[in-house]
Amino acid sequence: TPINQPSDLKGLKIRVQQSPTNVEMMRLLGGTATPMGFGDVYTALQAGILDGAENNELALTDNGHGDICKYYSYDMHQMVPDLLVANYAFLNGLSDEERAIFEEGFQIVKSTEQDAWEDAVAEAKDKAENEQHVNFIYPDTAPFQEAMAPLHDSVLAANPELQPIYDRIQQHNAAHTAD
C-alpha cells in the first residue's frame, strides 16, 4: 500500500522497534504498531502478519524486504542521527595538539562515513527499483511531522532537560531545509 499521508496507515500493521516511543509514534500516525525483533520482520511480511515496516533503504534490499514490499515512502516521520560520543575527561585530557589531531581525524571519519552511507543508499535504491521493482514515494512530509508534535511535547514534558537540545535541532532543521 503506498503511504502518501498519515491516514493511509489506518488499519495497517507496521513493524516498529520495541519501545514505547515507537509504539506511540505509530499510533499517532494512525497505524497499528507491531513491535517485533528485526530478525522476524521478513517472515512476518511474507506471511502477511505485517503490512509494512519502517526502516532504511539498506534493510529494504539487504534483508529482502523489497522482495515483498513494493512501496517505500520517504515521509520523514522519524530521523535517526548517527552520533560519535566522547568522554569529557578524555577530551579535556588532550593537549591542544592532540585535540587538533582528534578533531581533524573526526572530520575525516565523518566525511568518509557520510560518503560511504550515501553510496550504499544509492546502490540500495538502484537495486530496489531495478531488481525488486520497489516504487519510491516522496509525499508531503508536513502532515507526518505534524502528527509527531504530540509525541515531541510529551517527551519534552517528561524530560525538560532535553528542551535546549530539541530547540537546537529545530533551529538546525529550519536553517537546512534543503538538506
Regions found by a protein language model. Name each.
Residues T1-D179:
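N-terminal secretory/targeting leader peptides
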